[in-house]
From Swiss-Prot:
Record region (Coil 2): 258-403
Source organism of this protein record: Drosophila melanogaster (Fruit fly)
Coiled-coil region list: none
Keyword entries, A-Z: Coiled coil, Intermediate filament, Nucleus, Phosphoprotein
Compartments where found: Nucleus; Nucleus lamina
Protein name: Lamin-C
Predominant place of localization: nucleus
Length: 621
């Protein structure tokens, strides 16, 4: 509390001169030469008394005339001063009312703008909250698309590797097919040679079979001829035997039989040897031909089977290669489509992110601009409050000095609460000291006197003013928020902006004020309904305990210049906070005025709006 010192020095000097209007004082001298009678003596005394009374009456009349003239002059001066004061007061009142109306209009516009800004900020926060999930969703979709693109790219690399491997296998199989074709051609030529050999062997076999048949027929013919010759020889020998001695016949027959048997054995042995040789040679040739034919047939069949298998394998590989080429073409088309889609999605996502960032930047710039405008309006309002308060003090002082009855005015609170700021003006006291000093000298004459007055008043005033400003910052993660925390530590108010009921069992509300900290833990069964509020009162607030909307704790909330209120849930996670910081703003005002020509100057110290106060007071006074 700063003191306001007012020093009023009044110096009044008046010089009066007495101008005799008529008559002179006569001294009655009573001669002692003649004897006086009592009647004469009484008459002389009465005459002297009448003369003295006449002199006094003349002085009184002169004094009354002077006083009436002075009174008339003072009345005119007073009327002129009253007219001047009334005119100045009317002008001051008009200017004050005009400035007050403008200030009220500006305050209303500021309140409307503040409400509009709060609505816009809330809408922007809601839009931001709505856009954040969409941004997260789009980011997740972009991440999934990138993962799919990488997956498809990996698949494409695998398919491309398989395709390259298939091309290598195809080239290898083509080389093998060429080698097999050459081998097949060689085997075909070998088969032709074997067929020719088989035909030659078949011809040789036929020739051998014909020779064998010829030899058999020849042998049969010789056997028949031999048998016929034997028969003829027997018949001749029989005839001869019949003619020879029986003994000789028997010897001869025995010898003949032996010779024939030897000859037969010889021929049969020779025939058997020849037959065995022929059969062995034939069998060998046949076996060789069969083996060669089997080898040729097996080689041809193997070559044919290999050619068929190779053709089948080549056809399968060609079909597989065609399928792989078709699959590769489809995958390439799909990859190009996905790449185009991914590029489009990336461009759209980047454009969306850019638009969101531009919108957020625009919103930040707009919020910063609106906050600057609001800060300017708050500064203007503070300066206007200071000007209005100083003007009200000065006007009250002038009204008291001029004994002007002013109509009752509603007192306005100097506290301001707007958009998280609270201003409180500390009451300022003003002490004044009026020191009138004057000098009046008058020389009364017999017939009267005239007086001239000069009055001069010097007033020095100074005023110190201190204002306290509270800046508020509130934040909430869920539906439950802290909407108000009393600066005097009487209560803290919570509000559920959602529609569902919130169970407060295990929740804790902590107040940190300077070095002091106090925690209030909600009891079991505490809750707050949707759209409702709950207030936690200090023990000295004088409020009854009425759950669930009014809760009274056993202690008092601490108070300091910097206060922080934090609401934590049952998991010890902070869900809401409310910060209030106090800042002091001081101002100094000085005023100097004289009674001749009012001249006033004001100087504001560190308070805001000193230029406006100076200009306003220069305009008013």
């Amino acid at each position: 509390m700063s003191a306001r010192r007012v020093t009023l020095n009044t110096r009044v000097s008046r010089a009066s001169t007495s101008t005799p209007v008529g008559g002179a004082s006569t001294s009655s001298r009573v001669g002692a030469t003649s004897p006086t009678s009592p009647t004469r003596t009484s008459r002389q005394q009465e005459k002297e008394e009448l003369q003295h009374l006449n002199d006094r009456l003349a002085c009184y009349i002169d004094r009354m005339r002077n006083l009436e003239n002075e009174n008339s002059r003072l009345t005119q001066e007073l009327n002129l001063a009253q007219d001047t004061v009334n005119r100045e007061t009317s002008n001051l009142k008009a200017v004050y009312e005009k400035e007050l109306a403008a200030a009220r209009k500006l305050l209303d516009e500021t309140a409307k703008e503040k409400a509009k800004l709060e609505i816009d900020i809330k809408r922007l926060w809601e839009e931001n909250d709505d856009l954040k999930p969409r941004l997260d969703k789009k980011t997740k979709e972009a991440t999934v698309a990138e993962n799919n693109a990488r997956l498809y790219e990996n698949r494409y690399n695998e398919v491309n590797g398989k395709y390259n491997q298939s091309l290598a296998d195809r080239k290898k199989f083509e080389d093998q097919a060429k080698e097999l074709a050459l081998e097949n051609e060689r085997l075909r030529r070998q088969l032709d040679d074997l067929r020719k050999q088989l035909e030659a062997e078949t011809l040789a076999r036929v020739d051998l079979e014909n020779q064998n048949q010829s030899l058999r027929e020849e042998l049969a013919f010789k056997d028949q001829v031999h048998t016929q010759e034997l028969t003829e020889t027997r018949s001749r020998r029989q005839i001869e035997i019949s003619e020879i001695d029986g003994r000789l016949s028997r010897q001869y027959e025995a010898k003949l039989q032996q010779s024939l048997q030897e000859l037969r054995d010889q021929y049969e042995g020779q025939m058997r040897i020849n037959r065995e040789e022929i059969e062995l040679l034939y069998d060998n040739e046949i076996q060789n031909l069969k083996a060669a034919a089997n080898r040729a047939a097996q080689g041809s069949a193997l070559a044919t089977e290999e050619v068929r298998l190779m053709r089948t394998k080549i056809d399968g590989l060609n079909a597989k290669l065609q399928n792989l080429e078709d699959t590769n073409a489809g995958l390439n088309a799909r990859i190009r489509e996905l790449e185009n889609l991914l590029d489009t999605e990336r461009q759209r996502h980047n454009q969306y992110i850019a638009s969101l960032e531009a919108e957020l930047q625009r919103m930040r710039d707009e919020m910063a601009h609106q906050l600057q405008e609001y800060q300017g309006l708050m500064d203007i309002k503070v300066s206007l409050d200071l000007e209005i308060a100083a003007y009200d003090k000065l006007l009250c002082g002038e009204e008291r000095r001029l004994n002007i009855e002013s109509p009752g005015r509603p007192t306005t609170d100097s506290g301001i609460s707007s958009n998280g700021s609270h201003l409180t003006a500390s009451a300022s006291s003003r002490s004044g000291r009026v020191t009138p000093s004057g000098r009046r000298s008058a020389t009364p004459g017999i017939s009267g006197s005239s007086a001239v007055k000069r009055r001069r008043t010097v007033i020095d005033e100074s005023e110190d003013r201190t204002l306290s400003e509270y800046s508020v910052n509130a934040a909430a993660k869920g539906d439950l928020e802290i909407i108000e925390a009393d600066v005097e530590g009487r209560f803290i108010k919570l509000h559920n902006k959602g529609t569902e009921e919130i169970n407060l069992t295990g929740w804790q509300l902590t107040r940190i004020a300077g070095d002091e900290e106090l925690a209030f833990k909600f009891s079991r069964g505490s809750k707050v309904l949707g759209g409702a509020s709950v207030t936690i009162w200090s023990v000295d607030a004088g409020t009854a305990h009425d759950p669930p909307n009014n809760l009274v704790m056993k202690k008092k909330w601490p108070v300091a210049n910097s206060m922080r209120s934090v609401l934590a849930n049952a998991d010890k996670e902070d869900v809401a906070s409310y910060d209030r910081v106090r800042a002091n703003v001081s101002s100094h005002t000085s005023r100097h005025r004289s009674s001749g020509t009012p001249s006033t100057g004001f100087t504001l110290g560190s308070g805001a709006g000193s230029t406006g106060v100076r200009s306003l007071f220069s305009l008013l006074f």
